[in-house]
Amino acid sequence: MLFGYLVGFLAADPEERMTSGGKRVVVLRLGVKSRVGSKDETVWCRCNIWNNRYDKMLPYLKKGSSVIVAGELSLESYVGRDGSPQASISVSVDTLKFNSGSSRPDARGSDEGRQRANDNVSIGFDGESLDTDSALDKEVYAGFGEDQQYASEDVPF
């Protein structure tokens, strides 16, 4: 199993579909920017959200939204419009979060819309609820605000 984290922008609003077996899936088309040499490239990924996961977030996911996705990655092949073989990345989404570090101001929308999006929306890992107003105002990471003292023998290399 290949597991990965992707950070990117939605290329379109989420699409809700039903499989032939009657299972519900919401598809996100995610553009992930990467730099190859001096050239920027965008890798397009299809992110599948199965069943009713993240339903509270879906009304706030719009084209241009910056998101963080974690899940099982798979590579799929298909024949392009010109007849040449192509490859795409597919993600079975385990975790979906809004990316508060978005560099696109239009992706967030108005302050009122952002406030509605932050109200009681489960956006954390394993469905934990976060106080997004305070999280947007400060950097939060492991050990944030703690005074760390390391001795040279603590470093393993």
From Swiss-Prot:
HAMAP family registered for this protein in UniProt: SSB
Top-level taxon in the UniProt lineage: Bacteria
Domain SSB positions: 1-100
Chain segments annotated as coiled-coil in the UniProt record: none
Biological source species: Chlamydia trachomatis serovar D (strain ATCC VR-885 / DSM 19411 / UW-3/Cx)
Gene3D superfamilies associated with the record: Nucleic acid-binding proteins (2.40.50.140)
Any GO molecular function: single-stranded DNA binding
Protein name: Single-stranded DNA-binding protein
Signal peptide: none
Quaternary context: Homotetramer.
Keyword Chloroplast: no
A GO BP annotation: DNA replication
UniProt xrefs under InterPro entries: NA-bd_OB-fold, Primosome_PriB/ssb, ssDNA-bd
Keyword annotations of the record: DNA-binding
Cystine crosslinks: none
Region Disordered, annotated ranges: 99-131
Gene Ontology, cellular component aspect: nucleoid
